[in-house]
């Protein structure tokens, strides 16, 4: 169970420094971690806060670095990251709450306006908790707030700088293969096209609790291995991309009654992990990583490849990198020379 919780934390997609990542946000047991399992305990004992890595009053989220499993309290324990996030409201439960007599404390009153602190019952007071344990220095840096810098990556930059840098990193995506091979999260799969070349699985993103549709968020993960990102796509991949767009939209309509014109379907560049995947989010949801500097609408990707099969090998792409990302310095140096 501890291993499962650790692996799922690694893939929290878009809690990655935006994105898993994300993710974001890998498992060895199918059917665990989907909100239906029995109550469990955290996979460690104790949690001594060492540092607040990041917090956002707007997003109601905080990232904490702590020491756990300490024997003496002298720093001999292990590192862990705990992410606490207030969950979205569920309209039906809130309506029931307001019909009753909720516990209130008056904070302010003036004419027709008044402000209270309301203390909700247990079913409305849950806090989504993501655990990264044991946490490495890379995890700590990933969640630490950093300044961002825009870079423009040419096709040559990708081939000569970005790709060699990625290939030099130990970026495990075993958790992706576990999903595709049904070794983990098999009961969470909403739809599958099993074709090994042009098929995919559609699965709810871990950032979505599946309790309401306002923040609907699913991920399509292609079965075909070796496609790292947008940069690898050519006309050869058009059947796969068309399948993901059409069949993904149809599956979401069947399961959640959300029509295609109410969905935002896009790829990230840079992605939070390097196995081709596509994001499906509710159009009105301000999903992490949906900004113009990172999101590429799938329909437009298809159009671009239809007109120029090597569009993404040639095109200059703009994206943001954290100040501490080694790739930023590599690209800046290459562009100066």
Swiss-Prot record:
Entry-annotated residues carrying Phosphoserine: 24, 101
Top-rank taxon: Eukaryota
One of the record's GO molecular function terms: 5'-(N(7)-methyl 5'-triphosphoguanosine)-[mRNA] diphosphatase activity
Biological source species: Bos taurus
One Pfam match: DcpS_C
Catalytic reactions of this protein: a 5'-end (N(7)-methyl 5'-triphosphoguanosine)-ribonucleoside in mRNA + H2O = N(7)-methyl-GMP + a 5'-end diphospho-ribonucleoside in mRNA + 2 H(+)
Chain positions recorded as substrate binding sites: 175, 185, 205, 207, 268-279
Protein name as catalogued: m7GpppX diphosphatase
Renumbered ranges of motif nuclear export sequence (NES): 142-154
Biased composition (Acidic residues): 16-29
Homology family: Belongs to the HIT family.
Active-site residues, Swiss-Prot/TrEMBL: 277 (nucleophile)
PANTHER family reported in the protein's UniProt record: HISTIDINE TRIAD HIT PROTEIN MEMBER (PTHR12978), M7GPPPX DIPHOSPHATASE (PTHR12978:SF0)
Native organism taxonomy: Eukaryota, Metazoa, Chordata, Craniata, Vertebrata
UniProt subcellular location: Cytoplasm; Nucleus
